[in-house]
Structure formats: structure tokens, C-alpha cells
UniProtKB/Swiss-Prot annotation:
Pfam families for the chain: M20_dimer (PF07687), Peptidase_M20 (PF01546)
EC number(s) recorded for this UniProt protein: 3.5.1.14
Cofactor: Zn(2+)
Location of the protein in the cell: Cytoplasm
Tissues in which the UniProt entry reports expression: Expressed in kidney.
Species this chain originates from: Rattus norvegicus (Rat)
Cofactor binding summary note: Binds 2 Zn(2+) ions per subunit.
UniProt KW keywords: Cytoplasm, Hydrolase, Metal-binding, Phosphoprotein, Zinc
Protein purpose: Involved in the hydrolysis of N-acylated or N-acetylated amino acids (except L-aspartate).
Database matches in InterPro entries: Aminoacylase-1_M20A, ArgE/DapE_CS, Bact_exopeptidase_dim_dom, N-acyl_aa_amidohydrolase, Peptidase_M20, Peptidase_M20_dimer
Family stated for the protein in its record: Belongs to the peptidase M20A family.
Name of the protein described by the UniProt record: Aminoacylase-1B
Binding annotation for Zn(2+) 2: D113, E148, H373
Lineage, highest ranks first: Eukaryota, Metazoa, Chordata, Craniata, Vertebrata
Active site: D82, E147
Length: 408
């Protein structure tokens, strides 16, 4: 794949690079510049624009293309505006320059996650409007903050507000992942993030003595139990070629804390774990298992949640479902090979599904290495432009789904 010269650059690519240069990088994202960008884009495209401040300084921007039948539920195209931090010394180019090399690769934080999809939504809608299309269902595009740090000041709050319910969303699309093969991955559910702190208390004393009932000994037992569970899930994944990473529960020990000096046995120690719980797991039973591991370690061992999501939903992926039939049917017409999976991490889709709206995660990037959150995150302009073509077909198909039972 080769690149066009600057004078020949496709306008969609130019807009993409313009958006990439907006520094919406955590922990201090410039959300104001992003909101202004979408306001101006809405003005140029003749779309409705609504700003919803879900928390001080956290604005959800909603762009709307009304359908011809307002009694039907709408299509929601969601994307987040923030991106993760960078380590500039590990990048070949300035991570916010949107540098394009001679081969057509665009290097910028957010190129894959997920500013490409935001612009693909906009360019798909623009193309359909220019071609004179109208659809029965209203199309809403939501651009939300805070996803990269959990969405607690973004989509989690937005779905609880009357402005969200007024959108009357019947189906949603959100982010997915690149796929290095010829296929396109589509995500119909995701694992639930549980961030757990285990705290162990025991006898303190001088470190020269063989103390009994120490915090470290008991914490060691819990850590061993959890890591043994981790190994069991890893082996289950490795032994079954039909399983993907999102189908099992993962856990990693991410922090160890405790102690004040080399020669003092601490009274308290703690360990932090990041669990990603598969959607078919019995959440109540799994929490009871955590409790059991702590009890087996001895007295004074407890756990608490820093984050806990317990409402995993699965979007149907069979042809009897009208939304899936429209989505997969459009992909089939484009001869795209789909690989339905459970998303291994977490996205804002979980909040959308939790309020009863089916959602699919889809970033149309095949033959592309997965580079989100990585150094030198990049996307080829040809892959990006094909994604615009794909989303144009998908938006048209979804916005044309006939009235469903209960819709008049």
C-alpha cells in the first residue's frame, strides 16, 4: 500500500488527521477542543448538535440526523474522545502530530483507539446525506469522555440521564479491535472488570523473630489461591482452540503494598488484582469464591472492590435477530468475514447493554496489527478509508431495519 501526496490526500483522511491532533490524552484531556470540533462538524453537515454535561467538565456531544419515522427506535453510533497516555521517547514520530509516512501509515495516539471510528461515523453519514438518502430511523452519534479511565464520568452517568433516554436508542455500535488476518472481529459482549484489593492483618514485631500469624503469610495464601485459579483458566484457554481470550476469566496481580522498614514485620499488607470476569460466570458464586479464599487464609483477611461490574449482557448473534441480520447481512454483501467474540477488556458498550440496548463492538481494521495503547500506534489510510465505505453500508442497513414488534 502506498500513500497519495499531500495535494491528493482524501478529505476524509485530512479530517481524521485533524481530529487526531486534538490532545484528548489522559490524565488531562482537552475535551473542550474536541467538543468544538464536533460542533463545527455538525454545522457543516447540517446535523443537530446537543451538549450534555454529565459531570463538571465532562460533556457528551450528540450529533443527530433525524429519520423519517420518529416512532421507531434510533441507531446509536458511540465513540469515546479520550486517549491513553504516551511515552514519547518510544515513538518514531510526535504522537500527536498525525504524521503520515510515505507508505500511508498515520502515527498518532488514538489512530486505532478509537478516533478512526469517530470519523468513519461522520464520513459515512456525510456521504449518505450528500447522496440524498433518508432513512426511517434516526441516527445519533455520541462522542463521550472518560472511557479510558472507566467511563465513570462519561457513559456510566449518561445512560442514567433523561437526555440519553430521549434518544430512544434501539441498537448501538461502539469500538472493537483490529484483526491481523483477513477477517473482521465483532464483539457481542465483554468481560466484567473487577478490581479487588485484598487486605491482610497480622501480628507486627521485630523482623529478627519468627513471628506467627503475620499479615504476609496470610496474604501469601490468598495470592497463591488466586494465581492457581489464574493458571487453571490459562490452561483451559490453551487446551481449547475454539475458546478466545474473552471466553475465560483472567486475573493479574497488579500491586503489592505494605511495610514501613526492613526490620519491622508489618501489621497490614495488601494485594490488588485486576479480574476480567467472563459473561457466563455466576457473579454471586464467584464473589463467594473470593470470600472463601480469604477465609481459608486465616483471620483478619478481607477484600473490597475498587471497581465491580455485575451486569454483563450478550447481544444476539443469530439471524433471527433483526439487528444482527441487518449488520451481518450488510457485511456478507461486502464479502467481509466476521469473527464474533467476547471483548477481552471493557468498553462503554457495557453501560449501553446494561440498560437493555443491544450493542456490537466493531472497528473495521483487518490485516492490521492490534496497536491500541502501544508505542507507535498507527493505521494505514487505505484501511481507514475502507472503514468509511464499510460504515456507510452498515449505517444504511441498520437505519433501514423495519418496524419491530412494539414499534408503531
Amino acid at each position: 500500500m502506498t500513500s497519495k501526496g499531500p495535494e491528493e490526500e482524501h478529505p476524509s483522511v485530512t479530517l481524521f488527521r485533524q481530529y487526531l491532533r486534538i490532545r484528548t490524552v489522559q490524565p488531562k484531556p482537552d475535551y473542550g477542543a474536541a467538543v468544538a470540533f464536533f460542533e463545527e462538524t455538525a454545522r457543516q453537515l447540517g446535523l443537530g448538535c446537543q451538549k450534555v454535561e454529565v459531570a463538571p467538565g465532562y460533556v457528551v456531544t450528540v450529533l443527530t440526523w433525524p429519520g423519517t419515522n420518529p416512532t421507531l427506535s434510533s441507531i446509536l453510533l458511540n465513540s469515546h474522545t479520550d486517549v491513553v497516555p504516551v511515552f514519547k521517547e518510544h515513538w518514531s514520530h510526535d504522537p500527536f502530530e498525525a504524521f503520515k509516512d510515505s507508505e500511508g501509515y498515520i502515527y498518532t495516539r488514538g489512530a486505532q483507539d478509537m478516533k478512526c471510528v469517530s470519523i468513519q461515523y461522520l464520513e459515512a453519514v456525510k456521504r449518505l446525506k450528500v447522496e440524498g438518502h433518508r432513512f426511517p430511523r434516526t441516527i445519533h452519534m455520541t462522542f463521550v469522555p472518560d472511557e479510558e479511565v472507566g467511563g465513570h464520568q462519561g457513559m456510566e452517568l449518561f445512560v442514567q440521564r433523561h437526555e440519553f433516554h430521549a434518544l430512544r436508542a434501539g441498537f448501538a455500535l461502539d469500538e472493537g479491535l483490529a484483526n491481523p488476518t483477513d477477517a473482521f472481529t465483532v464483539f457481542y459482549s465483554e468481560r466484567s472488570p473487577w478490581w479487588v484489593r485484598v487486605t491482610s492483618t497480622g501480628r507486627p514485631g521485630h523482623a529478627s523473630r519468627f513471628m506467627e500469624d503475620t499479615a504476609a503469610e496470610k496474604l501469601h495464601k490468598v495470592v497463591n489461591s488466586i494465581l492457581a485459579f489464574r493458571e487453571k483458566e490459562w490452561q483451559r484457554l490453551q487446551s481449547n482452540p475454539h475458546l478466545k481470550e474473552g471466553s475465560v476469566t483472567s486475573v493479574n496481580l497488579t500491586k503489592l503494598e505494605g511495610g514501613v522498614a526492613y526490620n519491622v514485620v508489618p501489621a497490614t499488607m495488601s494485594a490488588c488484582f485486576d479480574f476480567r470476569v467472563a459473561p457466563d460466570v455466576d457473579m454471586k458464586a464467584f464473589e463467594e469464591q473470593l470470600q472463601s479464599w480469604c477465609q481459608e487464609a486465616g483471620e483478619g483477611v478481607t477484600f473490597e472492590f475498587a471497581q465491580k461490574f455485575t451486569e454483563p449482557r450478550m447481544t444476539p448473534t443469530d439471524d433471527t435477530d433483526p439487528w444482527w441480520a441487518a449488520f451481518s447481512g450488510a457485511c456478507k454483501e461486502m464479502t467481509l468475514t466476521l469473527e464474533p467474540e467476547i471483548f477481552p477488556a471493557a468498553t462503554d458498550s457495557r453501560y449501553i447493554r446494561a440498560v437493555g440496548i443491544p450493542a456490537l463492538g466493531f472497528s473495521p481494521m483487518n490485516r492490521t496489527p492490534v496497536l491500541l495503547h502501544d508505542h507507535n500506534e498507527r493505521l494505514h489510510e487505505a484501511v481507514f478509508l475502507r472503514g468509511v465505505d464499510i460504515y456507510t453500508r452498515l449505517v444504511a442497513a441498520l437505519a433501514s431495519v423495519p418496524a419491530l414488534p412494539g414499534e408503531s
